[in-house]
Structures are given as structure tokens and as C-alpha cells.
Amino acid sequence: LFCGPRGVGKTTCARIFAKAINCLNPQNGEACNECESCRSFNEGRSLNVHELDAASNNSVDDIRNLIEQVRIIPQQGSYSVFVIDEVHMLSAAAFNAFLKTLEEPPRHAIFVLATTEKHKIIPTILSRCQIYDFNRIKVEDGVEYLRYIASQEGVTADDEALNLIAHKADGGMRDALSILDQVIAYS
């Protein structure tokens, strides 16, 4: 269970984990980006990673459809990774429908649940999860990454402006990148 404020990288980390765990030639725990599994992931055609946005797909039927997918053995790589974003939005009935699968998953299935509101997840689900807390990104780290992105885009960026963007984003890299993108677009 990845917990933390919006925009700090929970879903991105879940995707990176899903890619790395299925890499056929991992290097120091990192995905190689060259094997067929990594290439299919990078091109958006991996059949081993399944994402469910529980904010809009939160019914028992949505979970039952996911449970049906869990039964399918991966065609490439070792694992099927199921990322359930905004998991706190599942209905109580959907949580209960999911519980047995979470308790006794097939060997090839890994679930990564992401939430901004851990307190809304029923205790029976929480007790079956390893919990990882994500924190807001420090302003100086945000500035450093924004500087990197600006240089990659060939954009000259003033440190004071990057600092202001990082402050306005309040520790959310997604928001910082969105603000930077808007500033670049209107410059």
C-alpha cells in the first residue's frame, strides 16, 4: 500500500516497480530498458501491468472484473502487477469482494494499492498490506528536478522562478511539472 499526498509519485513508483519486477535482465535492481518486457512496458503494450482507477471504477463488478484478470497467467515475465489507484474510493462491498483474492493471490499476482487517504481503507485490507508512506517532495529537490527538466527541454530557467514553482506545488512534483509546462507555454 503506497500512501501519501497527491502528486508525490505513488502511481509512478508502482509502474516503475511493475516494470522492474518483470525485467528479464535486471541490472542492480533496475530495469534494463532493453529486454522485450521492458520494451513492451515502455511502448504501453505490456500485458503484465493492469491499472484500475478506483475513483471511477469502484463497484463490486469492477473488482470482479479485476479478479477475473488476476487468474490469467502472464505471457511474458514472471508477474502480473495490478495497480489500484485511489483504492480508498472502493465501496465497502468492493473491498469485501477483493479481500479473498488479496489474502490468497495466485503466485504470479502482485497488488500495489495507492491512496491519499489510508484512514478510509477497511482494517481487514490494511492488515494484509505492507505499508509505504510517501512524503511531500522538498522544495530544494523540486527545484533540482525542475532545473533538470528545463535543461532537457532546452529552456533557460531562472532559479528564483524554479524556486517559486516548487513552493507553489507544495511538495507535489506533478503540480510542479504542470506549472513549469504552463510557464514555458506562455513564455
Model-derived regions, located:
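P-loop/Walker A NTP-binding region and its immediately flanking N-terminal helices
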Residues: L1-I131
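Extended, largely alpha-helical regulatory/partner-binding modules appended to the mid-to-C-terminal parts
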Residues: K19, E43-L47, D62-N65, S78, ...
